[in-house]
């Protein structure tokens, strides 16, 4: 497999002088195309910070992130935002669905923002909702869905622009064990069908065990890979 993402000598710190806190300390990590990775470790070890920098939601203090060989943080803000929107999908612990819109409309939203006509956006959104097992919930609003269903809508929305990389930050953190298993099965299914590269931050050891690779962080450093 060829390399999709390379993290090189990455550091992230906050503050300065005696108040400086170093969250990431010289991270090196290569992610291959089509790979599935779990980032694990105790709370406060820098897992979510690393994921956010990999997804260009935050910038490193030093080091680089290369996507397809390009140092993405050399891009200007507008170019970086465009790259992020089309190349990376995100799923968070909370679904962040828009409550006034239906499941179908929520999944269509990234396409509409990207300038796709409403008539053209419906079909791919409907197809993805079918893939995550929600073909019967197209017209339901988030408040009418269970927690697991809400998260599956969020997964569909994250994939609707066909990103190469899907990043998930504690996607089952608010769910019970049975529902967590359903969300995991959904992630596995879309990975197999679409070949999307998947990186997950999780405390769920069962979920981590299903990933192809586990990367463990301790005190801002990779200690096992």
Swiss-Prot record:
InterPro entries for this protein: AAA+_ATPase, ABC_transporter-like_ATP-bd, ABC_transporter-like_CS, ABC_transpr_LolD-like, MacB-like_ATP-bd, P-loop_NTPase
Main localization, broad class: membrane
Single Gene Ontology BP annotation: protein localization to outer membrane
GO molecular function, one term: ATP hydrolysis activity
Membrane topology: Peripheral membrane protein
Domain of life where this protein originates: Bacteria
Gene3D superfamilies per record: P-loop containing nucleotide triphosphate hydrolases
Keywords, comma-separated and alphabetical: ATP-binding, Cell inner membrane, Cell membrane, Membrane, Nucleotide-binding, Translocase, Transport
Subcellular localization: Cell inner membrane
GO cellular component, one term: plasma membrane
Pfam family, one: ABC_tran
PROSITE patterns the record matches: ABC_TRANSPORTER_1, ABC_TRANSPORTER_2, LOLD
Enzyme class, spelled out: translocase
Subunit structure: The complex is composed of two ATP-binding proteins (LolD) and two transmembrane proteins (LolC and LolE).
Function: Part of the ABC transporter complex LolCDE involved in the translocation of mature outer membrane-directed lipoproteins, from the inner membrane to the periplasmic chaperone, LolA. Responsible for the formation of the LolA-lipoprotein complex in an ATP-dependent manner.
Name of this protein: Lipoprotein-releasing system ATP-binding protein LolD
Species this protein is from: Geobacter metallireducens (strain ATCC 53774 / DSM 7210 / GS-15)
Gene name for this UniProt entry: lolD
């Amino acid at each position: 497999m060829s390399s999709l993402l390379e993290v090189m000598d990455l550091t992230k710190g906050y503050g300065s002088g005696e108040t400086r806190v170093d969250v990431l300390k010289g991270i090196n990590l290569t992610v291959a195309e089509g790979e599935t990775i779990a980032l694990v470790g105790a709370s406060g070890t820098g897992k979510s910070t690393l994921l956010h920098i990999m997804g260009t939601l935050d910038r490193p203090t030093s080091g680089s992130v290369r996507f397809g060989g390009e140092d993405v943080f050399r891009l200007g803000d507008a170019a970086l935002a465009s790259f992020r929107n089309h190349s990376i999908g995100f799923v968070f612990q909370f679904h962040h669905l828009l409550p006034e819109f239906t499941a179908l409309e929520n999944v269509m939203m990234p396409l509409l923002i990207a300038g796709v006509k409403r008539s053209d956006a419906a079909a791919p959104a409907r197809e993805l909702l079918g893939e995550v097992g929600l073909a019967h919930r197209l017209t339901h609003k988030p408040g009418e869905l269970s927690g697991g269903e809400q998260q599956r809508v969020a997964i569909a929305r994250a994939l609707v622009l066909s990103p190469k990389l899907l990043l998930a930050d504690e996607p089952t953190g608010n769910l019970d064990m049975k529902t967590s298993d359903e969300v995991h099965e959904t992630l596995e299914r879309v990975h197999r069908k679409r070949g999307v590269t998947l990186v997950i931050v999780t405390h769920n050891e069962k979920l981590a065990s299903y990933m192809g690779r586990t990367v463990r962080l301790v005190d801002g450093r990779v200690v096992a890979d």
